[in-house]
């Protein structure tokens, strides 16, 4: 542990160790606190009644009270009050306030804030931004509200919308009204980049990792919401009519084109996830008959059906979380080590449980009977998967291209000609085709196409 120039540390625990030392620096004031291994609290940070998880970084006069920060959080310049900051909650800006909310994998834009007080019965309201949600500059949410996973919040939202069943959406304010664009973030280059960067930014060096983190963008947790979202959008269309210009949902408005695109985006993601699961399940085995395929498809456990939850980084079946809670209530689980061991077991068995869930959804979505599935059914699913993966990658590719458009070059080549502006842009940003992200997308299309073709070839000759 390294403590240097600190103003006050009162009534706290510093859980440092040799593999992941804690650094507490100049001007820091902490009262009633716990700081976990590998964390750095520096430069005038003020903490009151706070828990700081592993490998967090708090600095530049950050101020927090009554809050929990789990692993790999970053807080600089701004303020937090009564928040549950799950892994990778990041706020960098002086004018940003996070208050009375639950967040994880979240990036707060400058000037983002929320209100939990409506000047009636006091500050009693709270809200949730599910994993991967982010806010733009000067965004505002009046709690209570719930923002769906991997959604983007832009503008001021005061109507208490719950969009948890419409993940990967944009929430945009126009003339004091929340407009919802469902599923559009699935094709965003930013979403894919986020998913790639989080594992790389895991700074934990402590061999005893306290948080179990699942980085999967598509999981039973998000796909179950897409199934619900697809049903919601189809029902809105049925009730209000296909020709309606605007649909109303949860005090938000959805344009006709956005609704139809939302259904399409969710179906693409469902095809992608279920196809991924089936390819993974059948990989590396030479099947001789349809019966062999059916036997391989059968799940290894019954655990995994039903609802799934995000436990601040850990994605698990709700049935397993309920089983743990029952154990705590009846006294059979009475040690923190036992609770942690349960979480570890859920995390380790994620793919086993995931397949149980996916197997049931494959039957439901594709209308298949488990006793009658044939190689031809699998080929049909894999072809739909291939179309979904390539289609989504092409959308991401087109989204990335916008970053290399003429309008993106504005601001380069300070006072030169149009050609100098273009040259300056290319010197700094490179050209589109050689961009590392773009080449990765093209390789992904190639690899996934080959993967699908390999399975089709492997089982294509099975007739019986």
Model segments located where?
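Structured, charged N-terminal subsegments at the starts of enzyme catalytic cores
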Residues: 1-4, 8-9
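Glycine-rich hexapeptide-repeat left-handed beta-helix
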Residues: 9-32, 37-241
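Terminal amphipathic alpha-helical/low-complexity segments used for targeting or macromolecular assembly
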Residues: 164-464
């Amino acid at each position: 542990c390294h403590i240097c120039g600190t103003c006050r540390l009162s009534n706290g625990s510093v859980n440092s160790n040799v593999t992941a030392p804690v650094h507490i620096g100049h001007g820091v004031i902490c009262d009633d606190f716990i700081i976990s291994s590998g964390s750095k609290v520096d430069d005038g940070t003020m903490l009151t009644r706070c828990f700081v998880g592993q490998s967090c970084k708090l600095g530049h006069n950050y101020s927090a009270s009554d809050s929990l920060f789990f692993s790999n959080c970053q807080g600089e310049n701004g303020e937090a009050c009564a928040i549950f900051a799950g892994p990778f909650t990041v706020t960098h800006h002086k004018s940003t306030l996070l208050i009375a909310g639950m967040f994880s994998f979240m990036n707060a834009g400058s000037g983002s804030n929320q209100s939990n007080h409506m000047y009636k019965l006091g500050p009693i309201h709270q809200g949730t931004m599910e994993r991967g949600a982010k806010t733009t500059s000067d965004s505002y949410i009046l709690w209570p509200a719930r923002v769906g996973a991997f959604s983007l919040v832009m503008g001021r939202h005061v109507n208490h919308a719950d969009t948890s069943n419409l993940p990967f959406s944009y929430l945009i304010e126009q003339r004091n009204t929340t407009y919802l664009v469902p599923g559009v973030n699935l094709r965003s280059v930013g979403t894919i980049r986020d998913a790639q960067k989080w594992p790389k930014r895991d700074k934990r060096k402590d061999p005893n990792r306290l948080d179990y983190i699942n980085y999967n963008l598509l999981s039973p947790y998000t796909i179950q919401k897409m199934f619900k979202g697809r049903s919601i959008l189809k029902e809105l269309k049925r009730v209000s009519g296909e020709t309606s210009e605007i649909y109303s949902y949860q005090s938000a408005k959805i344009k006709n084109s956005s609704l139809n695109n939302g259904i399409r985006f969710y179906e693409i993601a469902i095809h992608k996830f279920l196809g991924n699961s089936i390819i993974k399940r059948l990989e590396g085995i030479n099947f001789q008959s349809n019966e062999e395929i059916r036997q391989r498809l059968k799940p290894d456990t019954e655990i995994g059906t039903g609802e799934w939850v995000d436990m601040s980084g850990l994605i698990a079946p709700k049935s397993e979380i309920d089983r743990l809670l029952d154990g705590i209530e009846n006294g059979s689980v009475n040690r923190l080590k036992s609770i942690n061991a349960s979480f570890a077991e859920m995390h380790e068995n994620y793919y086993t449980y995931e397949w149980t869930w996916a197997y049931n959804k494959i039957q439901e979505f594709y209308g298949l009977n488990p006793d009658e599935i044939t190689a031809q059914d699998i080929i049909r699913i894999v072809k739909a998967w291939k179309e979904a993966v390539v289609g989504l990658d092409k959308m991401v590719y087109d989204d990335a291209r916008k970053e290399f458009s003429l309008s993106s070059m504005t601001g380069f080549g300070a006072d030169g000609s149009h050609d100098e502006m273009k040259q300056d842009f290319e010197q700094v940003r490179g050209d589109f085709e050689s961009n590392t992200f773009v080449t990765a997308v093209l390789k992904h299309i190639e690899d996934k196409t080959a993967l699908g073709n390999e399975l089709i070839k492997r089982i294509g000759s099975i007739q019986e």
